[in-house]
Amino acid sequence: MLARYFTNLDRPVFALRNLPEVVKGALFSRYSRTEKSLRRVLLDEFINEPDSGFAQLAGTQAGADDMVAVRRAEEFYERVLVGYGDDSVAELAGAHVAVERVSTLAAKALEDSRIGISPLEKSTRYVRFDRPGPDGRYLYHRGPELAHPDYEVAADSLFKTYSELIEPLTLAIRERFPLVEGETDRAWKAATRAKALDMLRGLLPAGTLTNLGLFGNGRAFEYLITKMAGHELPECRGLAQDLHRELDLVIPSFVKRALDDRYGAPAAERISRIRAETARMAPRNHRSGAGPRVTLLEHDPDAERKVVAAALFPLSDAGWKELEGDPAALLEAMLGDRGNRRQRAPRALEHAQYAFEIVANFAAYRDLHRHRMLTQDRQLLGTALGYDLPIGLAEVGMDGRVRSAIEAAAEAHSRMERDAGPALAQYVVPLAFHVRWYFRVNLREIYHLCELRTTPQGHPDYRWVAQEMFRLVSEVHPRLARYARFVDMGPGDELERRRSERRMDEKLSALDRTQ
């Protein structure tokens, strides 16, 4: 009977299967209130307890009406979890949600959640964005709030330029990087196409439609919905309603408060009100020099001592202030034998803290925004900080067309900002334009971020940011930084994806040999 629901019946570690999310969450919640094993709880309190509702719920798993199943699950949850705190229990069950045809701006708002939600988004490196929609038009966000006469003209021009340059640029790249010995045609074509898309991604406006998948727990989704409901963009507020409607069909008990009159709606209104009140105090129209840059705003002069104390603390019986040691010897013991970047730096390094202000193009921001073990926020996307163009576009004579489309979009942005406000004007800004944001990050995450984002196959825009961050940390804390030995400060691969695609071929070949 129980074998259907667990991966084994006789070992202390096992996985759950063939159970609705709400039942899994309810089962795990019982760990805090019973001495029984989970398998015994399922048998005694769920399967053999007629009033639990489990029989009806389990019976809906195989083909019964989905709506009936969900409502039974909600009733089950309420019955079993009376007296439990909803918040912690809501972290014990989750859902997968697909969000399609949303703007890049809205995608960033969805992905801004740091804990409890894991996103994955359509890539500008591997996927063309010029395929028309069912109505034959380019895929960028349109809505009544974006009825400005310049918006669609500028966005269409950006997409048209992007679309018309993909094939000739790909051919030019293939002439510059011909097929080499030992490289398959598949790998070569994939690497050269990715290079072309990388070089042209700066043309895409922030209103470009993208797709993403979200996996998260109920508590995280509840807050995401509330936060989106208080967003300044109408598109994001609409997504709050869409997310709530769809999640109410699969995990209703976990998102029931997200927009309700008692909790969710007042919280969303408060988010909106605080933003408006704070905005009135924030200076605007400040002019600063254009161009990318990374600035170290803050660092802790006492970081070495704190790292030493944090490393010794769990192994000592002394108090924090009494813990002292030789930083060089301790760092060598903890990090001296690191063989690759996947051998993580220890938690003690989290006690060295840094704050950076970064100005880089919005495309690079999108890549670095994915990092979670830090605090970050950005300013509104605009055109005042200038934009980047890949050097390779000038080498093939395509920079003129790209500049023309980008600068026409900048003029449209100026008029939209005047007429519709800076938030809505973001939609027309190409990804090539710079945005300013901050990172507050610890040294452990510096190791992870900089070693990952400086690999030779990475995009040069975010490689440069990661290299600058690491250079600045190395200047103030050379001894703490020296063991991040897998940071690559070199120029990177000219054809960034060539090495990765060749490795993929090797993996595919090995897989074929085993089958």
Each PLM stretch: what is its role?
Residues 1-515:
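A conserved ligand/cofactor-binding region detector
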